[in-house]
Amino acid sequence: TGRDKMNIVLLSGGSGNRLWPLSTPENSKQFLKILKTDDGRTESMLQRVFAQIHRVDPSAVVTVATSADQAAEIHRQLGEAIKISIEPDKKDTFPAIVLASSYLVDVLQIDPEETVAFCPVDPFADDSFFATIRDACAYISSVQEHLMLLGITPTAPLEKYGYIVPKAENDISLVASFKEKPDKKNAQRYIDNGALWNAGVFVFKLSYILKRAHELIDFSDYYDLFQKYHTLERISFDYAVVEHEKDILVKRYNGCLLYT
């Protein structure tokens, strides 16, 4: 069945100001072949992440959500088999995630009841990070809750992450609250209260996000949405979806994670 493979979308390009546009000198970094492989070759961040996902799940369906000007380079690095959801305009994470979700259902013909994970394109982590995402996908497909996030066990009171406060210390817990990126003192306070770093990973069934999308956007399918994309409001996924969901789950990841 399709249920036992991981659907994962790597958010790049037009999905947020931090990553837009990738063609600027400081942001072409995920394409630069500066990482050493075990056998001494060099690879880019994108190639490394792609290989890691397939080590964790050889049958994974990997899609990159990005701007049109990056598509050729992504195909060059990952081959023609990589799926690309092209964003025709610079919007925020909600439109990007909705467009990619519609692409999976309407273009790739993935069952809307399947689960998908959205992840930034540039996590520097070991394979266990992607194994945790795979496990989150399997979990959310079997429970009534709609949305799962990944929480990283903090190693220091960093100011660059948002924080997730879980209700319990279990591997998987309901979320009690979210905290915006804090200053150092508040970060330490959050950590003392058991907060986790928000890894920026969202896991949900495609049907869930498309239902929410149709409540906020008037469109019939992927092709219609693509045509209207330039008219969409800029709105973050957190603001459009996360803030309105009552029961959000967080899964812990105890390993190391850096966003390059």
Walk through the language-model features, giving the residues of each.
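A short, charged helix-loop
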Residues: 166-193
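N-terminal glycine-rich phosphate-binding loop and ensuing alpha1 helix
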Residues: 2-73, 80-82, 86-91, 103, ...
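Predominantly late transmembrane helices and immediately cytosolic-facing juxtamembrane segments
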Residues: 209-256
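Conserved small/polar residues in nucleotide/adenosyl-binding loops
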Residues: 259-260
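Short beta-strand segments
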Residues: 10-12, 65, 117-120, 149-153, ...
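Hydrophobic packing residues within well-ordered alpha-helices of enzyme cores
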Residues: 19, 74-75, 187, 209, ...
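A conserved mid-domain beta-alpha-beta active-site/ligand-binding segment of alpha/beta enzyme cores
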Residues: 195-204
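Conserved beta-loop-beta/alpha segment of the NTase-like Rossmann-fold superfamily
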Residues: 82-169, 211-215
